[in-house]
C-alpha cells in the first residue's frame, strides 16, 4: 500500500510540471493559457511558436508519463499499480498543482505512459493518432479517437481486466477535456492543424530581401515576408514618388500648352494726323 501511494504521488507531481508554460516562458512565447486555443499543451504551442517548440513540449509531456511508469516497473509494482501510476501522471498534467490546476488535455502524457506500460499499445495509439490527423487534419479528433481505443487495445494485447479501469478513466478524462472540441467539430468551427513560422524561420526567410537590397542599391525592395497590409503600404509608398513626378510633368505640359494658345498682345498702332491749317 505504501508503494502504491508513493507511486501515485510521484506520478501526479511529475505530471504537474507543465512543460508548455515553462517552454513559452523560457523562449519568450505567448502564454498558452491566454493565447491560441488557451490550452497549455503541445498543439497550442505548435500554433503559437512553431514546430521546434511544439515538438519540444510534446517530448517533455511524453516523458512525464514515461518516467513514473518506468519507476513503477523498476520497483516491481503490480500491473494495476503501474496503470494507476500512469493515471496519476495524466491527472497531474491536466490539473497541475504548480500552475493553479490549469493544465493541458493529457494526450502526449497518456501516449508516453502507454509506451512505457506496454510498448505495442503505445505504438498502436500513436499510430491511430497519426493516421486520423493525417487524413482529417484535426488534432482533437485524432486525440479523441486514439485515446478512446487505448483500453480496448489493452484488452486485446494484455488481457488483464484489472488494468482496464484506470485506462478507461484516462479515456474519460481526455474526452472530458475535449468537450469544447466536440462542439466545434459538430459546428464545423474546429481549426485544423497548421504550422506557424518560428522566429528563426522568419529571420532566415527575411535574408533574401536584404541581399536584394545589397544587389540593387538605390531601388525600392518590397519585403515579401510581411502581411498583406504592409505589402500594400509599401507598394503605395513606391508608387507615390512616381505619381508626383507624373503630376509635375503634366503640370509643365499644361502650362506650355496654355502659353502657346494665348494670342499675342498687339498694341494698336496710332496714326498721328496733322491737320493742315
Swiss-Prot record:
An example Pfam family from this entry, by short name, is G3P_acyltransf
Region described as Disordered = 207-277
**Which intervals of the chain form a coiled coil?**
none
Please tell me one Gene Ontology term that the record gives under cellular component: plasma membrane
Q: In which pathway does it act?
A: Lipid metabolism; phospholipid metabolism
**InterPro entries listed in its UniProt record:** G3P_acylTferase_PlsY
Q: What class of enzyme is it?
A: transferase
| Keywords (A to Z) from UniProt | Cell inner membrane, Cell membrane, Lipid biosynthesis, Lipid metabolism, Membrane, Phospholipid biosynthesis, Phospholipid metabolism, Transferase, Transmembrane, Transmembrane helix
Where is the sequence biased in composition, kind Basic and acidic residues?
A: 216-239
User: Where does it live in the cell?
Assistant: Cell inner membrane
| Biased composition, class Basic residues, residue ranges | 240-253, 262-271
Q: Name one GO biological process term.
A: phospholipid biosynthetic process
List where the protein spans the membrane.
3-23, 55-75, 79-99, 111-131, 155-175
Q: Name one GO molecular function term.
A: acyl-phosphate glycerol-3-phosphate acyltransferase activity
EC no. given is 2.3.1.275
- What's its membrane topology? Multi-pass membrane protein
- Please write the reaction equations for the catalytic activity of this protein: an acyl phosphate + sn-glycerol 3-phosphate = a 1-acyl-sn-glycero-3-phosphate + phosphate
Q: How does it assemble?
A: Probably interacts with PlsX.
Q: Which family does it belong to?
A: Belongs to the PlsY family.
Chain's role: Catalyzes the transfer of an acyl group from acyl-phosphate (acyl-PO(4)) to glycerol-3-phosphate (G3P) to form lysophosphatidic acid (LPA). This enzyme utilizes acyl-phosphate as fatty acyl donor, but not acyl-CoA or acyl-ACP.
Name assigned to this protein:
Glycerol-3-phosphate acyltransferase
The opening ranks of the lineage are: Bacteria, Pseudomonadati, Pseudomonadota, Gammaproteobacteria, Legionellales
Amino acid at each position: 500500500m505504501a508503494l502504491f501511494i508513493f507511486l501515485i504521488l510521484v506520478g501526479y507531481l511529475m505530471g504537474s510540471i507543465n512543460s508548455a508554460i515553462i517552454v513559452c516562458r523560457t523562449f519568450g512565447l505567448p502564454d498558452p493559457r491566454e493565447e491560441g486555443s488557451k490550452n497549455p499543451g503541445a498543439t497550442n504551442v505548435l500554433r503559437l511558436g512553431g514546430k521546434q517548440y511544439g515538438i519540444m513540449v510534446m517530448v517533455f509531456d511524453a516523458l512525464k508519463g514515461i518516467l513514473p511508469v518506468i519507476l513503477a516497473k523498476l520497483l516491481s509494482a503490480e500491473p494495476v499499480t503501474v496503470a494507476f501510476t500512469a493515471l496519476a501522471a495524466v491527472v497531474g498534467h491536466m490539473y497541475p498543482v504548480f500552475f493553479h490546476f490549469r493544465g493541458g488535455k493529457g494526450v502526449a502524457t497518456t501516449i508516453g505512459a502507454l509506451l512505457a506500460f506496454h510498448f505495442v499499445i503505445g505504438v498502436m495509439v500513436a499510430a491511430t493518432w497519426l493516421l486520423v490527423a493525417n487524413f482529417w487534419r484535426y488534432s482533437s479528433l485524432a486525440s479523441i479517437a486514439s485515446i478512446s481505443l487505448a483500453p480496448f487495445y489493452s484488452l486485446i494485447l494484455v488481457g488483464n481486466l484489472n488494468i482496464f479501469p484506470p485506462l478507461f478513466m484516462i479515456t474519460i478524462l481526455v474526452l472530458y477535456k475535449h468537450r469544447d472540441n466536440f462542439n466545434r467539430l459538430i459546428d464545423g468551427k474546429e481549426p485544423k492543424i497548421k504550422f506557424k513560422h518560428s522566429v528563426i524561420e522568419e529571420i532566415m526567410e527575411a535574408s533574401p530581401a536584404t541581399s536584394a537590397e545589397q544587389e540593387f542599391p538605390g531601388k525600392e525592395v518590397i519585403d515579401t515576408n510581411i502581411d498583406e497590409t504592409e505589402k500594400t503600404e509599401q507598394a503605395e509608398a513606391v508608387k507615390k514618388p512616381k505619381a508626383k513626378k507624373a503630376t509635375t510633368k503634366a503640370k509643365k505640359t499644361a502650362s506650355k500648352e496654355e502659353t502657346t494658345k494665348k494670342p499675342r498682345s498687339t498694341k494698336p498702332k496710332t496714326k498721328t494726323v496733322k491737320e493742315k491749317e
